[in-house]
UniProtKB/Swiss-Prot annotation:
GO terms for molecular function: ATP binding; glucose-1-phosphate adenylyltransferase activity. The keyword Lipid biosynthesis does not apply. Pathway: Capsule biogenesis; capsule polysaccharide biosynthesis; Glycan biosynthesis; glycogen biosynthesis. It catalyses: alpha-D-glucose 1-phosphate + ATP + H(+) = ADP-alpha-D-glucose + diphosphate. Involved in the biosynthesis of ADP-glucose, a building block, required in the biosynthesis of maltose-1-phosphate (M1P) and in the elongation reactions to produce linear alpha-1,4-glucans. Catalyzes the reaction between ATP and alpha-D-glucose 1-phosphate (G1P) to produce pyrophosphate and ADP-Glc. SUPFAM superfamilies: Nucleotide-diphospho-sugar transferases, Trimeric LpxA-like enzymes. InterPro entries: ADP-Glc_PPase (IPR011831), ADP_Glu_pyroP_CS (IPR005836), GlgC_bac (IPR023049), GlmU/GlgC-like_hexapep (IPR056818), NTP_transferase_dom (IPR005835), Nucleotide-diphossugar_trans (IPR029044), Trimer_LpxA-like_sf (IPR011004). NCBIfam families: glgC, PRK00725.1, PRK00844.1. Belongs to the bacterial/plant glucose-1-phosphate adenylyltransferase family. This is Glucose-1-phosphate adenylyltransferase. PROSITE patterns: ADP_GLC_PYROPHOSPH_1, ADP_GLC_PYROPHOSPH_2, ADP_GLC_PYROPHOSPH_3. One of its GO terms (biological process) is glycogen biosynthetic process.
Amino acid sequence: MRASPHVLGIVLAGGEGKRLYPLTADRAKPAVPFGGAYRLIDFVLSNLVNARFLRICVLTQYKSHSLDRHISQNWRLSGLAGEYITPVPAQQRLGPRWYTGSADAIHQSLNLIFDEDPEYIVVFGADHVYRMDPEQMLDFHIESGAAVTVAGIRVPRTEASAFGCIDADDTGRIREFVEKPANPPGTPDDPDAAFVSMGNYIFTTKELIDVIRADADDDHSDHDMGGDIIPRLVADGRAAVYDFNTNLVPGATERDHAYWRDVGTLDAFYDAHMDLVSVHPVFNLYNRRWPIRGESENLAPAKFVNGGSAQESVVGAGSIVSAASVRNSVLSSNVVIDDGAVVEGSVLMPGVRVGRGAVVRHAILDKNVVVGVGEQVGVDIERDRERFNVSAGGVVAVGKGVWI
């Protein structure tokens, strides 16, 4: 049996997330709450920890306080065996400037790699919702002999322009990689589908250091992992693709096998929440064999009183539903729904309060939003456009701490 290779995890968590505004007005995109008990970064960290990759640096930059605090409070490892998950804010090690791209973030953090001296480096994004066993991808990478392995997934061709598109041969060697093309290529067996990058990479350490340094010396580069680093290695014939569909996660159901969602827009973020609420959810939060770990608050259980009810919904700890109706919704912790209120098809983040007789439909309410007595959100869309952000799909998004 082969000894476990020495692996360093680097999580790219500096994203601003402009398309998720107002949810990112006060926090980095990976810190946005999700699913009633988590933040977006919890999915990648859970996948790495479940696979026993226990040396992880999280590179942060944009409005990172809540993200840094969340990692420090909820992701403490023992440290006795050299295990750690540590947030690393931008250090300006190469002069008085911030990260100019994801590749530059690694270039400015090469000291972390030199300190750890790993054989392989797992470079994953921090803002997707999915389960994955990265050890299986590492095995594929080692077997392939490539400098980099890119995790790939099939998506409808109409959606592929938002991603890096991959063309590979039968062995998995990448022949072409185009970042966010206007006219994405279809796959050989399905012209209506495209094979795209998930933003997750595994590098052999020396190869990563060499290509990062070469990119840093290129004045014409945008210093982006998908736009610059991967195409360099593809051009040299040293990049392989790992098919995410072959990844077998313990406890996965037939419905959520190979589930992966980019939640970079309000509509995608909303839709991913709606994947959680059915009797047989598209994405199952209750897989104990591959748990997603999140907030570790000590809260009382959720409570339903005076005939309050919740149907096809996820309700977080500490929440109270009193003589109110909740349907097809996700309620985070410490949410209060008062008498006669109706919440339908909505996402309520921690500390939200919905007053007596109020109605909330097809909406995302950020932390500590208060909906006043008899108020309505998501009922009169034109009125909502005057007050709040409304997505292309008609989802009403109300920013943190707003009183309505």
